[in-house]
Curated annotation (Swiss-Prot):
Belongs to the short-chain dehydrogenases/reductases (SDR) family. It is found in: Endoplasmic reticulum membrane. It comes from Saccharomyces cerevisiae (strain ATCC 204508 / S288c) (Baker's yeast). Residues 1-290 are lumenal. The gene is PBR1. This is Uncharacterized oxidoreductase YNL181W. Gene3D superfamilies: NAD(P)-binding Rossmann-like Domain. GO terms for cellular component: endoplasmic reticulum; endoplasmic reticulum membrane; nuclear envelope. Its EC number is 1.-.-.-. Residues 312-407 are cytoplasmic.
Amino acid sequence: MPLNIIGTALLDGTDKIPYYQTIKKVAPYVLATGAIKYWSRGPSNTWERKLHGKVYLVTGATSQGMGTSVAYKMAELGAQLIILTREVDEWVTEWCEELREKTKNELIFVEKCDLSNLWEIRKFATSWLDNSPPRRLDGVIVMSGDMEPWGIPKISLPQRRSSKDGLELQIATNYVAIFHLLNLLQPSFKAQPPDRDVRIILATCWLQVVGDINIEDPLWQNAKYKSALKFFASSKLQLGLSMMELQRRLTEDIKNQKTNGAERTGKNVTITMVQPGTMRSNSLRRVISNGSVVLLIILYCILLYPILWLFTKSGRRGDQSFLYALMTPELEEVNLKDTKVKYISDCSIVKFARKEFDDEELQKKLFDNTERDILQLEKKVAAKRNANKTGNQNSKKKSQNKSRKDD
């Protein structure tokens, strides 16, 4: 067909081509739209890596967007996945079975671990570490996160939601939970053999550039809730800074180990922050709709969707930078020039935008204060939990004694 059109234009002139004038007017707009869409979808990962026999902990895999796409690709390549979910209900069980069938990989499992609950995180980490010999672990892929509606100025103020531990939900889920999980799993990372390429890959967001760092109150327990965006951006910023310190600690501890008398470089365990780009994700839908179904239909689905389709990625296109971080040989020990945390955007390693990423003293203080405050909060919540348990037991005994007297 294109050859016939070109031949007609060359031999008989463009006047012989049907609807040529219409095509001439419309074509530039079509080409421009195609070019914008090609740019907005971002580059594709070109690396491949065999994952057979490798074991990964994965969060955010049930999102039906980027997380699901990454998990599907990893399962397809033969990886054993332990997927952490808030609940292991009927839907999650069916989803897991479907993923096994589609990828022909039976080594996909789901574990209950609510990342908004510090106690559940500690229970999971303790059960993971309570094994001899140490369990194999080739990486942790963190794609979970929470973004609360920003509210509408002068109409609808942002509503603060809290985790089970009383923390603001975005700080709890995006920062505290991931920090706590990875900090507790340090012994597992250090126990891996020197020839094992262990990759810890975490999702971040370009909005971190507008975040704040609360050194003295890193869990933001005493901060006023004026802006949901500020809490979200700060959670991502503090996560990135804390991971810089965690990487240094892991590297130094591994370097101090000796395997059969051989020195270790500590480069076999790497932490990478991935910025997948602006996607048409559940988070974006919640922000645009302000949590309203009516606004979701009118504003997102009808009015803004053509623009969003043109300038943003689909949730499944956002997986490319994650797959790049998982598969690129640039992060292998033999190719690493330094042990710093890497920042990946659009399938390439780029520099962090904030100057705080060069401040090691600030990162160390943030890490230490976060670790301290989490421990204090855990003790406080545990005391309350034990008090409630004791109260329930006493109430049960009283009711039993009363029923005996009545008999």
